[in-house]
Amino acid sequence: MHASLTRQTVPWEAVIAIDGADPTRLPAPLAADPRVRTVVTPQRVGAACARNLALNTVRTEFCNWADDDDEFEDHAMATRLHILKETGVGWCAGYSQDLHPDGSTSLWTCPAPPGRHEAGDVWTYWKHPSDTIPIGPTTILARTDLVRAAPMGGLVQGEDYMALGVTNLAPGILLPIPVYRYRKHPGQMTKQATYDQLEAASREHAWNYGRSLSAALRSGEALAHG
């Protein structure tokens, strides 16, 4: 991840959430980079909690969740930042690619179609909890205030599904180009033997959250307009 960040063409900062681990194990290139800061929890609290605590320290106008074993495309930040600045939407996303051990990639085209989406529209492309999520959470660059309003939730896995909540809070644009590479390897969480035990429940919780959030916001708008 860090190597891909160094190839970005716009300024950036990174906050690394270290979940109860020894911070001295941080690789030397990251520890030496002044653009990288860490938030260390004194005990293991889980990815969702650790990431939410790290979010407290974000200083940039826009924010993008990411996993340390994945990569951004070289143009990812500049392309989406340009859209955000030019259009004034709250978020901008793209497609992702699976990065396989042999270095090859395969494109994942998300269910939501490319183009502009009004607040709440993206969730309509997630018809059932077991269906494919409508947009890749780590492909979304969004205003930091929106990310703080719809963060990672408290799930022990699938916490990134909750991050899709930002699409209910403001209009956004989905670009039909890959911006993120999701590295496939045996050590990833989704490959662990226990992963399936909570996957269905995590999906259902996130799905209900998004639908309820969208409904509540639309109800509030209706009341405001009489």
Describe the role of every protein-language-model region.
Residues H2-W12:
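Short, acidic, metal-binding catalytic loop of nucleotide-sugar glycosyltransferases
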Residues C63:
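Short aromatic/hydrophobic "clamp" motif used to bind/position activated sugar donors
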Residues M77-W108:
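Conserved donor NDP-sugar-binding/catalytic core segment of glycosyltransferases
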Residues Y95, C110-T132:
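Short, flexible, basic/aromatic active-site loop/helix in glycosyltransferases
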Residues Y95, I173-V179, R183-K184:
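Catalytic beta-strand/loop signature of glycosyltransferases that borders the donor
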Residues G120, Y182-H185, K191-G220:
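Catalytic core of nucleotide-sugar-dependent glycosyltransferases
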Residues V156-M162:
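Acidic donor-binding loop at a coil-to-helix junction in glycosyltransferase catalytic cores
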